Amino acid sequence: MGISKRAWQVAGAAAGGASLFGGGLAIGRLLRLDSQRGDYRKAWEDHNLATLDRLRQLDEHPEGERPYLIVSLGDSSVQGMGASRITESYPARLASSIAAQMDREVLLLNLSLSGATIESVELTQIPQMRGLGLLDGPYSLDLVTLTIGGNDVMAEDMAPGQFEERLRRVLASLPAGALVSTIPSFGIMPQESRAQDMSDRIAAAVADSDAHLVDLRSLTQEYSLPTYTFAYHAADFFHPNSAAYTKWAQLFADAWATSRREAAPVVEDAPQWDMLSARVAQSEYDD
């Protein structure tokens, strides 16, 4: 999945408005940001393989308290697209915060996919969890996070009712206590009403399940339009930047702590996540 039509439109406008973006510099930054897609995917794949190897080793040779195991599902925002470094993605920052709070080893499997829709989660990511023994299998799963819907909002053939039906089936497959987020604001884009409708459906589905809601939509609606457009987003004007992902991670950490009836960890105070990957990608984009 390449650069979105929306991103090209915004970057093109930026190139014509040098006073805002330095002309063609905006398009150059956009292209560099898009290179994250492959880099981050490969880094997460490498990390996941190393994590699975660690789980197998522990299964064969248990050593003390088992690690706290997190699985993250969803789309490119879960991959960390837009963050300057993959370790600044919200799953990595959340995992680091939980590890610091619990003083315990935390293992993170990120099964998300850039461009994913709710159909992708139901038909690809959930079966992948089953195949890896994470659902009704040998591994004890402690937490699942799910962020999905942004691509569904943009897909004209995805009816909101169909989105909700698939989401409810996904939630029924997940262990209790999953953290599920609403869809961030689409600002002045014409799809904003669909984003609101689908977010409302996410909230309703979560309320009928054993999951917990993480309200990213309310967070993003608090920003003024200029701040949301230029300070919150990365160069593609679609994905959050590193600072915004820190706020996402804090909301997830807050929901996690509330579900456990304990004080929430401070995400900004947690150390950088130590990924089990020799391919920890760092984009050239400097936000």
Each language-model region and where it sits:
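N-terminal secretory targeting modules
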Residues: 1-71, 259-287
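Short amphipathic alpha-helices and their capping/turn segments at secondary-structure boundaries
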Residues: 47-66, 122-140, 168-172
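Conserved SGNH/GDSL esterase-like catalytic core that processes O-acyl groups on lipids
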Residues: 69-71, 79-162
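Helix C-cap/helix->beta junction micro-motif
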Residues: 102, 174, 208-209
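Conserved beta-strand segments of alpha/beta enzyme cores
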Residues: 107-109, 177, 210-212
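Amphipathic, non-transmembrane alpha-helical secondary structure
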Residues: 119-130, 161-168, 172, 246, ...
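Active-site segments of SGNH/GDSL-like serine hydrolases
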Residues: 147-151, 170-199, 217-221
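Catalytic His-Asp segment of secreted/periplasmic serine-dependent ester chemistry enzymes
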Residues: 188-287
